[in-house]
Amino acid sequence: IYEAKLPRALFIIDTEKGTLKEIHSDSAWLNHVQFSTTDPDLLMFCHEGPWHKVDRIWTIRLSTQKTMLMHKRTMPNEIAGHEWSSPDGKTIWFDLQQPRSTTFFVAGADVKTGKEIKYSLKREEWSIHFNLSNNQQLFCGDGADPGQVAKAQNAQWIYLFRPNGDHFDAEKLVDMKHHGYKLEPNVHFSPDDKWVIFRANFEGIEN
């Protein structure tokens, strides 16, 4: 799909009027659309494909159809992805590796200015997915098995991360060594931030 460079489009649907409107077209593989958590006029989307070949994370303002690149790669084999919007809608957070499988960060880009902040973490703390608490004070991660991009041997944990300067301090919450990571845990916080919620198959086969 990535190599084909076929014409593609983003569109929105008015659920009250039942109308469809095209808002953006490109030959890139457009994918992973997410509305802002607070601004219904702002949509995040991605140029999908091999992460080391694409500047992946973009936004588009529906009222003007103006697009903005959220993170531009700065070195060979750099990857950024698994992006999500902060609860207040001001930041897009993502997994950043500079370069791939070598140096690991969780980074955030301001949706208005593009200014970035990033927190480093250890190889064994890298997670397939990260998420942010509703009060925006804590992060969580779902770990990974040795077959994932970090190739870590002791990363099969549900993690709680506390930002500390330019890095994360990690706390291990759940041992996932009996979980099969073909089912990605996809961590997130409960609305009151008292729980980290995740999927797991260590008690049996998932449906």
Give the positions of each predicted feature.
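Conserved beta-propeller blade repeats
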Residues: 1, 25-46, 73-95, 123-142, ...
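N-terminal leader/targeting helix
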Residues: 89-118
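Short hairpin/turn module used for nucleic-acid contact or packing/dimerization
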Residues: 155, 161-207
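Solenoidal tandem-repeat scaffolds enriched in leucines and small polar residues
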Residues: 1-60
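Multi-bladed beta-propeller domains
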Residues: 13-29, 60-79, 109-126, 161-183
